[in-house]
Amino acid sequence: MKIKNYDGIIEHHKSVKSTNLMAIEKIQNNEDFDWLIADYQTDGRGRSSNVWDSPVGGLYATRVIKDNNLDYSHISQISILSSVIIAYTINKFIDGWNIKLKWPNDILIGGDKLCGILIQTLNHDNNFYIIIGFGINVK
């Protein structure tokens, strides 16, 4: 399913291998999209090729930014900004919980990992892409 909204194209899938992997494949195939969202990932990934457990009931998404004014030097800033924005958003829904950031890419609640963020980059057809994937396990 594709949804057209004010901020671009959002694709929702019931199951994917990995939203980041799907994003990379879509970029390489010159497909137009901004967000990929999945109910379940069969092969979710974290940093350093770690496995990210992605059970049904979580939120697994990837946002792609295409901006040739950005480069690899901006990745750490984008990582920090992504963590803060996601933690802030989670806090809006579950106010009162003790949410903490564990740099560079984890969000903890009550000492347990609630969310992981994986940022990747891709150069394709003379364009620079930043791929921001995150998984929120809510069960």
Kindly give the residue locations of the regions a language model identified.
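N-terminal lobe of the biotin/lipoate ligase/transferase fold
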Residues: 1-92
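A short coil-to-beta-strand element that immediately follows conserved catalytic motifs
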Residues: 34, 96-102
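Beta-strand scaffold of nucleotide-dependent catalytic cores
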Residues: 37, 116-118, 131-132
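Active-site glycine-centered loops adjacent to acidic/histidine catalytic or metal-binding residues
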Residues: 44, 106, 135
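Glycine- and Gly-Pro-enriched alpha-helical subdomains that act as flexible
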Residues: 102-103, 108-109, 113-114, 118
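Short, low-complexity Ser/Thr-rich regulatory SLiMs
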Residues: 121-123
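Short, acidic (Asp/Glu-rich) active-site segment that either coordinates a divalent metal cofactor
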Residues: 126-139
